[in-house]
Amino acid sequence: MMEMPIDNLWSQVLERLQIELSRPTFETWIKTANAERLENNCLVIITPNPFARNWLQKYYISTIANVVQSILGHPVEIYITVAKGEEFEEIGGGGEWELPTTNIINETPNQNRQPNTELNAKYVFSRFVVGANNRMAHAASLAVAESPGREFNPLFLCGGVGLGKTHLMQAIGHYRWEICPNSKIFYVSTEQFTNDLITAIRNDSMQSFREHYRAADVLLVDDIQFIEGKEYTQEEFFHTFNTLHEAGKQVVIASDRPPNQIPSLQERLCSRFSMGLIADIQAPDLETRMAILQKKSEYEKIRLPRDVIEYIATNFTSNIRELEGALTRALAYISIWGLPMTVANLAPVLVTPMEKIEATPEAILTVIADNFDISIEDLKSNSRRREISWARQIGMYLMRQHTDLSFPRIGEEFGGKDHTTVLYSCDKIAQLVESDRGLSQTLRQLSDRIKMNSRSRKP
């Protein structure tokens, strides 16, 4: 059977991908690629540079393969390469950084991995950046990996989205496989556990379900907060937990909140979850965020100027996913436009307004007064002392950023100041922050404290 002409095939692939993918994704990554040839059941796709090749390999090769299969009626192998003369080109022109010339997606997975268990090859201890925000969680995870079923059982990792809970859990799994290749390591989300349970009930195979999970040497359960309201799932998990714990097997659980804050969680489960160690993970501080970016750039074989690292770390503070996403966005932007890796070139693509949060004026006033070692009364006064006036201007700026209050209402919160005073203060700080990196860092730190202050006040 003759294969379809390559131009015709690629034209159809583009038509379907244009519908399936978002416009920015299609324009940036798919439209710039081209199909070179189709032979021996292998489609060769050419990309303009190594970064584009790696990006397609990492995120879109499966999508492309599925579309090609739907057109040809049979599966084909997809091989993505770089146009001749581009393989070793430094993108950016300034020689300030390099892109990897090796394909990062071809990491060899652990050959001892159970077929029902999926661990990310990048989630290992050596790639985890330790800081004040996660030191205890890291130490506890390493201790569990070295001696499972002993001191911290269960280990309950608690923290917000994108802070490294899943990384630590899977690092435990990888470590155990290195030490004991025949270990039965089960990593499962709470949703998957529930789905497996439903399937077992439907197929009348509850015994197999129980034997499967209770055979684990290490059970890693992610997002346990989603067990909320699932009474039968809680019942089965309780007995699975008991069986493993009594047998000296290790259980590691991750959640975005402590056990006692998971609604409708059975009291006996809450008690079991709390009987080991609850290790909290907070948002990383500036130094840790910079270290994370540095380590990621080293693994990707990219040289980043220190001021770029500091700029990204200062402006993206919520979690690690946001931080790494900003770096990825920066690399894509620089690659596409062929620009040097500088703060000035990255500023347009990394613009991120400060997060609007449900902060009360009182919470903001409290943080500002505490930071500048003055009183709230000083902030509301008519004092023109330099330190008080400066603190007041920053407070007005942050209140504008973190609330929906109008300029007149903000003026009222600061002791009845005129709205023109508030407008002047906000404009002044906004202009200064564009060139004053120290001020930008101060504002981010104050914003982080305001967020924590506001969350702690929620019922």
Curated annotation (Swiss-Prot):
**Record's InterPro entries?**
AAA+_ATPase, Chromosome_initiator_DnaA, Chromosome_initiator_DnaA-like, Chromosome_initiator_DnaA_CS, DnaA_C, DnaA_dom, DnaA_N_dom, DnaA_N_sf
Region annotated Domain III, AAA+ region sits at 118-334
Q: Specify which residues bind ATP according to the UniProt entry for this protein.
A: 162, 164-166
Give a GO molecular function annotation for the protein. lipid binding
Region of interest: Domain I, interacts with DnaA modulators: 1-74
- Keywords, alphabetical: ATP-binding, Cytoplasm, DNA replication, DNA-binding, Lipid-binding, Nucleotide-binding
Q: Would the keyword Cytoplasm be found if you checked this record's keyword annotation?
A: yes
Q: Origin, by domain of life?
A: Bacteria
Domain note: Domain I is involved in oligomerization and binding regulators, domain II is flexibile and of varying length in different bacteria, domain III forms the AAA+ region, while domain IV binds dsDNA.
Looking up HAMAP family in the UniProt record yields:
DnaA_bact (MF_00377)
- What name appears for this protein in its UniProt entry? Chromosomal replication initiator protein DnaA
Gene encoding it?
dnaA
